[in-house]
UniProtKB/Swiss-Prot annotation:
It comes from Arabidopsis thaliana. Residues 1-21 form the signal peptide. PANTHER family: CLASSICAL ARABINOGALACTAN PROTEIN 10-RELATED (PTHR36321:SF24), CLASSICAL ARABINOGALACTAN PROTEIN 9 (PTHR36321). The lineage of its organism: Eukaryota, Viridiplantae, Streptophyta, Embryophyta, Tracheophyta. Residues 25-39, 48-58, 66-86 have a biased composition (Pro residues). This is Classical arabinogalactan protein 10. The modification Pyrrolidone carboxylic acid is found at residue 22.
């Protein structure tokens, strides 16, 4: 009788591990582009601490012009709109990966049916 209970416990462990392995979860996120190799970092040169002489102002500052120069665009004119750009870079897939996602699969129903069948089978072994 002890060997039968060991077999039943092993079978229950197998059912539990398979149910955990088949449970839907978030898909792993990976970038479709390879990661670029980073160049080795070099130490930045230390700046010298010699004081820089301050230039003496030789000319008086001039006032800013009040009106824009002739031929320049007026501030009220709007720039043309930017051309439309795609949201995905060139060469990237338009849609997501072709694997199943948690939204569009029915693993939950299959998992529940398989678990119920497993429990019924184990219960029939015990009786």
């Amino acid at each position: 009788m002890a060997s039968k209970s060991v077999v039943v416990l092993l079978f229950l462990a197998l059912i539990a591990s398979s149910a955990i392995a088949q449970a839907p979860g978030p898909a792993p996120t990976r970038s479709p582009l390879p990661s670029p190799a980073q160049p080795p970092r070099t130490a930045a040169p230390t700046p010298s601490i010699t004081p820089t002489p301050t230039p003496t102002p030789s000319a008086t500052p001039t006032a800013a012009p009040v009106s824009p120069p002739a031929g320049s665009p007026l501030p009220s004119s709007a720039s043309p709109p930017a051309p439309p750009t795609s949201l995905t870079p060139d060469g990237a897939p338009v849609a997501g990966p072709t694997g199943s996602t948690p939204v569009d699969n029915n693993n939950a129903a299959t998992l529940a049916a398989g678990s119920l069948a497993g429990f019924v089978f184990v219960a029939s072994l015990l009786l």
